[in-house]
Amino acid sequence: QTFVTIPGTLRDHPDNLSLAGDGFDTVIKVSCADILTMATR
């Protein structure tokens, strides 16, 4: 549940991703996709 909660929190606070920079934003998006893919398998 921790892995699902963290991306969900980040989605609720887009300002945090913007402050972190586009590079960090991209990493989070990829990580979220990987976690969701693993969760569905």
UniProtKB/Swiss-Prot annotation:
Keyword Translocase annotated: no
Details of cofactor binding: Binds 1 heme b (iron(II)-protoporphyrin IX) group per subunit. Binds 2 calcium ions per subunit.
Superkingdom of origin: Eukaryota
E.C. no: 1.11.1.7
Any single GO BP term: hydrogen peroxide catabolic process
Key words, A-Z: Calcium, Heme, Hydrogen peroxide, Iron, Metal-binding, Oxidoreductase, Peroxidase, Secreted
UniProt KW Calcium keyword: yes
Cofactor: heme b; Ca(2+)
Family under the similarity heading: Belongs to the peroxidase family. Classical plant (class III) peroxidase subfamily.
Function: Removal of H(2)O(2), oxidation of toxic reductants, biosynthesis and degradation of lignin, suberization, auxin catabolism, response to environmental stresses such as wounding, pathogen attack and oxidative stress. These functions might be dependent on each isozyme/isoform in each plant tissue.
Protein name as catalogued: Peroxidase 3
Organism from which the protein derives: Vitis vinifera
